[in-house]
Amino acid sequence: WAVFAILVLGTALGIRLAYDRDSYEILAYDDLIRHERYQEVIRRAEKYQPPTPISACSVNFSLFMNGQLPARMPEFYQCGTQGLVLPSIRDNVSDLTSAELLWMMGMPNITLQYYFDSMESIENGRLSGRFLSRMADCNLVNGWYGPAEKYLDLLSHSLFYRKSALRRKEMVRNEAAVDADPVYAYVRSVRFRDDFITGYDHLDLMMSILYNQNSSNFMAAEYFNAWQRLKQMEGMR
């Protein structure tokens, strides 16, 4: 019995040591955000939040989606402006929340770059349906129908994305159909009017431009204000 007890205790301890809570939480945040369950991200962070930029980015995005970013940002872990939008990191997790919020804010070109980098980081060289799907969206919004069609052709042969891909293939080279889609129409209405990509260091300037060209882009305004606030906090340290 003593040997058995030691084995049980050792197994339990090994499982506990192997459990990386921070990584688990970050993956949980990603899954919840993917399914638009932002309040659950906040609830988890209220109990425990990993002290990492990826975590801060996910929680801040969830706060914004619940209309709580300005009021509640100080309650959670912050790490400067990287906690709002991460610079592109070539792995298959770090860029995802940043890419999604930049898509919603009206920066499909940078979103496309982030997802391309994420795809390139997959070690076995396989394609991700999730990444391809958003890359197709970015190309449709921009009117770049050749690449969009290529990505949608690939997705049309997949199990989980086939139906959506076939629906979107009908929009290729059909401006009226793209404009009739509420998500695409919104992103088109708030995106940059001029086609350019700039560096991470100028993201706050890009947010300002987005808001000035379309004052209904509340997300750009709120993220710009939060960016300046965090820069001031960094300067005081």
Language model region names:
Residues 236-237:
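Short, intrinsically disordered, charge-balanced linker/junction segments flanking boundaries
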Residues 15-190, 196, 212-233:
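Soluble catalytic regions of membrane-associated enzymes that act on cell-envelope
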Residues 191-208:
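Outer-membrane pore/translocation modules
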Residues 2-20:
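Internal/C-terminal transmembrane anchor helices
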